[in-house]
Amino acid sequence: MAAAVQDSRVNPGGKLKRSPKKKKKMKKVAKAAVSKLEDELKDSSGGEGSCESEMDDSDDGAAEADSEDNVESCEEENEVAAESSAGTNSGWADAMAKILNKKTPKSKPTILTKNKELEKEKEKLKQERLEKRKQIDKKREWEMLCRVKPDVIKDKEAERNLQRIATRGVVQLFNAVQKHQRNVDEKVKEVGGSIRKRAKLMSTVSKKDFISVLRGMDGASENSSAGKSPKARQTEVKSEEGPGWKILRDDFMMGASMKDWDKESEGEEPADGQAGSASH
């Protein structure tokens, strides 16, 4: 056993680099040898002195081996840390060198914080929105200028007067149209059934005739309204509310002229024939 322990000892003078696996194996072997020696010492009672000396020698050897292993492990850890720090430093240095050696175009700034093109675009869009909003507000103010919401309670009489004026104007317009149509119909009857004379008559009819009729009715209505009493005016307004124009009447399409439209056209043909024979 002593020979086995002596063989397991490590020479302190020769420091060799060992792998962590070998170190673990050496520690296990040393512990196993120590445990065997202790068991033998307990069993054997005769050779205590020799066993104790061997135990002391083995303990010293194991302690020396452990100390050497700890020193070597510390050295290896320091070397690994130095290599890792050197690797990170070299990577950082490479990255910085790449950035510093990079050539930037003259149109773009070298410092990225000074590159404020996006901020300028955002500011420009903001200004455009503000200008559009100002234009819209200005347009609304112009549209709402001099607009006043009518008060139903205060402006009741004024609204009634305006309604009366509007109804009078509409009734007067329809009466003027009716009178103008009557005048045209009378002239057509005077002409007779000749199509040429009718066409000539219709060509002479213009807007001025209608406007003159409308103005004449306006003056006549003013004169008549000035000479009438208030009660007569009210009755006139009520009568004017009814449909005075032919088109607004219920029996407009049922008149005699519309029923006999084909007879009139037949009667016109011989008249044209007579006119032609007279010319010959």
From Swiss-Prot:
Lineage: Eukaryota, Metazoa, Chordata, Craniata, Vertebrata
Cross-link (Glycyl lysine isopeptide (Lys-Gly) (interchain with G-Cter in SUMO1)): K238
Coiled-coil annotated spans: 21-45, 107-143
Citrulline modification, residue list: R9
Location of cross-link Glycyl lysine isopeptide (Lys-Gly) (interchain with G-Cter in SUMO2): K108, K179, K208, K238
Protein name per UniProt: RRP15-like protein
Modified residues (N-acetylalanine): A2
InterPro entries listed in its UniProt record: Rrp15
Keywords from the named record: Acetylation, Citrullination, Coiled coil, Isopeptide bond, Phosphoprotein, Ubl conjugation
Amino acid composition bias (Basic residues), ranges on this chain: 15-30
Top-rank lineage group of the source organism: Eukaryota
PTM per Swiss-Prot/TrEMBL: Citrullinated by PADI4.
Disordered, as annotated region: 1-122, 217-280
Family of this protein: Belongs to the RRP15 family.
Residue numbers carrying Phosphoserine: S58, S67, S206, S265, S279
Organism: Rattus norvegicus (Rat)
PANTHER family on file: RRP15-LIKE PROTEIN
Gene Ontology biological process terms from the UniProt entry: maturation of 5.8S rRNA; maturation of LSU-rRNA
A Pfam family it matches: Rrp15p
Positions with biased composition (Basic and acidic residues): 36-45, 233-252
Compositional bias (Acidic residues): 51-80
